[in-house]
Amino acid sequence: MPLGISKIERLEVYCNQEKVGVLALTHENLCAFQYDAAFLQNGFSISPFHLPLERKVFVAKPNPFSGNFGVFNDSLPDGWGSLLLDRYLKKNGIEVDKLNKLQRLAIIGSSGRGALEYVPDWSITEKATTHDLNILAKDAEKILLTKYHGNGLDILFKNGASSGGARPKVFLKIKNEEWLIKFKSSADPPNIGKTEYYYSILAQQCGIKMPLTCLFEKRYFGVQRFDRNATKRIHTISAAGLLNADYRIPSLDYEMLLRACFLLTKNMEEVLQLYRIMVFNVAIGNKDDHAKNFSFQFENGQWKLSPAYDLLPSSGFNGNHTTTINGKGTPDEEDLLIVAKKIGIAERTACSIKKEIYALCRK
């Protein structure tokens, strides 16, 4: 990435070396996207509800992603990753406020989550390098609490600038496997890593599909990346990106999310898996269940629910679930069954899932 950011008129979008289409900006500073002709013949809709596979120019709405499409906004960092990116760019003399959406996507380039990549590619990444997690954790804390811009900033940027969420994190390759490793934020309790690891194991016991998780150095929670496999990257879109839903505020109800899951996957087993996640979130008090904490993946010609992530107790908005249950931010167990009935899950099945999960979570 050049230190003097150049002007970009258009940005090419790729998925596993195949050109998907082209992004540009309108005079109103809205993103415009058009699929590539070859991709129209052989590809798939990267965002079925908002970018169907059609030969036309799509123009993004001003909200909720400031004139970007949700699927491309997913590539951009938020929270910790955004702080890292802005701090790193300022350190290198780049005026962050003057960057447009295309330039920010070019900075992410090939380093983003999921399968989408952007050309020109200005990304700077560092792969297959081992770092001392304790040192990285201390540097992350300095970045959060001070204006620190030492060598640790460069290392964390190269290994985590595309990440989302509030907590500091890095992508590292360990024994030829790619991991996302989290550190504690200034607001977290000291044992946050152990807590998240415990709930990741509990979620698996509750029948929820999770990526492989690990507690590094007995304190840092790690999750194996599920947007990659040995041969390719896997196209991944968050519920926020899929539904054009604002993840920063309450904007979804689980009924809407479950219906979208069925419309997208056409598979009731995927709906039941998402229902399990809803019940688990209510049972453990995970109220930070915003629209970016659910994702879908396209692989082998099929859409599916991604493995679950970010499952641990949290306070949410004023003690309410960010994604409501039967329209309520503070639901009771009966609301879980009402949602099941609304979306066509048999009462016997819903009761069985609820009973199983609550029994495990109350141990």
Model-derived regions, located:
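Phosphate/dinucleotide-binding and metal-coordinating scaffold of catalytic cores
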Residues: 1-291, 295-363
